[in-house]
A protein has these predicted regions:
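Structured loop/turn residues at beta-strand edges in well-structured enzyme cores
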Residues: 3, 32, 81, 130-131, ...
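Conserved SAM-binding loop
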Residues: 10, 39, 154
């Protein structure tokens, strides 16, 4: 909620977050194999890999040396009739020209996706870099802003996108309730046999309906417990990281 998103799902790594986020966006928006996503040439491998793994095509844009982010003039040049999204991945938390990229996306009907693994908490003109993103990922690897030993998260204000991401991370299961929201006092799911899955008229056991070709990317309870404590220290950690950057930059 702090970063402007109402829906999130935790997974076992930032790389997994990117994988299920791209899969969810492709399915939700109906992108086709071979559709293009513009990415920065300087970044981590698992920003790029999920694009290819989901049958899409990465289109690379070179960087500018002052911030290691994409050359905005090249972004304009790389747009084609098959471009569907721009996938930002701010290097070392350096803010990019958000005004220009948002204008570019609006003019060309493109979605802005944010790989926030390096930039959790980074701002541009007072706004978090994820403000205009249709979906965003973050990583809880030890070297990043928050640590859950390993872990990641997908966030979006489109509930269906997060539901799909959760399904892809939970084996592709059609039943993806959050936490204990539908549990009875005895711990049994109170809606397990209800008629609430789209496309299924008969009463079925939702636990064994798999609508996607999914994965097993669930986090451990321990990771969530560590993360809940780390959240309390986020401002402190962020302040220390900014201090360290100023010392070496």
């Amino acid at each position: 909620d702090r970063f402007g998103f109402q829906n999130s799902v935790m997974v076992n790594s930032g790389s997994s977050a990117n994988l299920v986020m791209v899969a969810a966006l492709k399915k939700y928006f109906g992108w086709e194999d071979g559709d293009e996503i513009i990415v920065c040439a300087c970044g981590f491998a698992t920003t790029i890999a999920p694009i290819v793994q989901n049958g899409l095509k990465p289109i690379f844009v070179d960087i500018t040396w002052n911030d290691l982010n994409w050359n905005m003039d090249q972004v304009e040049e790389k747009i084609s009739e098959r471009t569907r999204a721009v996938f930002s991945s701010p290097v070392l938390g350096n803010a990019y020209d958000m005004d220009r990229i948002v204008d570019l996306c609006d003019r060309n009907d493109l979605k802005l996706i944010s790989d926030n693994c390096d930039s959790l908490g980074s701002k541009y003109k007072g706004d978090y870099l994820t403000k205009h993103a249709i979906a965003a990922s973050c990583s809880f690897y030890p070297a990043h802003h928050l640590c859950t030993i390993e872990g990641g998260m997908v966030s979006s204000n489109i509930k269906e996108v997060v539901d799909l991401a959760r399904s892809f991370a939970w084996w592709g299961r059609g039943c993806y309730c959050v936490g204990q929201q539908n549990l009875l006092p005895n711990g049994v799911c109170g809606r397990r046999f209800d008629k609430w899955l789209e496309g299924y008229d008969d009463i079925v056991d939702h636990k064994y309906v798999f609508g996607q070709m999914g994965y097993n990317l669930k986090p451990l309870d321990l990771q969530g417990a560590v993360g809940s404590i780390q959240l309390l220290r986020f401002d402190e950690i962020h302040k220390l990281r900014r201090r360290n950057k100023k010392a070496i930059h």
